[in-house]
Amino acid sequence: MRRIFFTIVLLLSVFNMTIYSQVTDAEKTLRTKLADSTQGWKRGGVFALNLAQTSLTNWAAGGQNSFAVNGMLSTFANYKRGKTVWVNSLDLGYGLLKQGNLGYRKTDDKFDFLSKYGHEAFKNFYYAALFNFKTQMAPGYKYDDAAKTKDLISDLFSPAYFLLALGLDYKPSDHFSAFIAPVTGKITVVSNKTLSDAGAFGVKPGEKSLSEFGGYLRAIYTKNDFKSEFLKNVTFTTKIDLFSNYVKNPQNIVVNWETLIAFKVNKFISANINTQLIYDDKIKVPVVRNGEATAIGSLVQFKEILGVGFSYNF
């Protein structure tokens, strides 16, 4: 009887060790798969198209017919392997408005490509290099409806901004990163002769580019996994770029701050609020007082776009 008992105990021990070994191997395999899933390329993006129309016929209260369309494409392709991280993004935006008998006029125009390559230095910090290129895709005009004239104020590659920065990238989580670059080169290009001859966007009259050397900071925060029931379909992204020219007026910091809030109604319908604030002391705009342009100076520029329409994530 005792021999049978010890035999049963021995068999159970062997069986238990076999099961434990299988579970351990399964856990190792699962951990390996999870680790591999965070490595390599990750790609995606969102496309949004917003439309607005007003049509009036014999409307006693008055008003004008109008039609507006605004499109946005934001894509990314990110790579991670070991201690190496490579982040790439492309943001495009374009909008048109037709009101009354006036022709179509541009309301938005954006081309923004960014690439950042980093290698882990220590926990949450990466040695990094960043390249950024910004321009627009179509001419921009200042309209005088009374005189029925328009003046060219911007165009493709007028301006265009090239920025190359070397520094340290702080990334404590998937939601936030701050890139600090004490070594940064920035080139502003104005390829249109009419605009460059006028000294637009900070270039000297007659010259087509402006080179600057300074310090750069880029911080970005994005979140789409809010726990609140009210915010569960909301995506929030805000990013700010700061540049200081070491050589000339370093206290005059160039600011570019963008925020996007997207409310997902269902798979294909969403509402978006997009804002952008710019300050650059080299960009001169009309100073308007009492409805009249009285001077030319450096002012804070602000743009806000609110749209409801079709959206598709991929």
Residue ranges and their predicted role:
Residues 32-41, 78-86, 120-128, 175-178, ...:
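Short loop/turn motifs that connect adjacent beta-strands in outer-membrane beta-barrel proteins
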Residues 17-46:
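Sec-dependent signal peptide cleavage junction
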Residues 106-214, 295:
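Outer-membrane pore/translocation modules
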Residues 300-314:
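Outer-membrane beta-barrel "beta-signal"
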Residues 45, 49-51, 71-79, 113-119, ...:
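Residues on the lipid-exposed face of transmembrane beta-strands in outer-membrane beta-barrel proteins
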Residues 43-47, 86-90, 127-131, 162, ...:
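Transmembrane beta-strands of outer-membrane beta-barrel proteins
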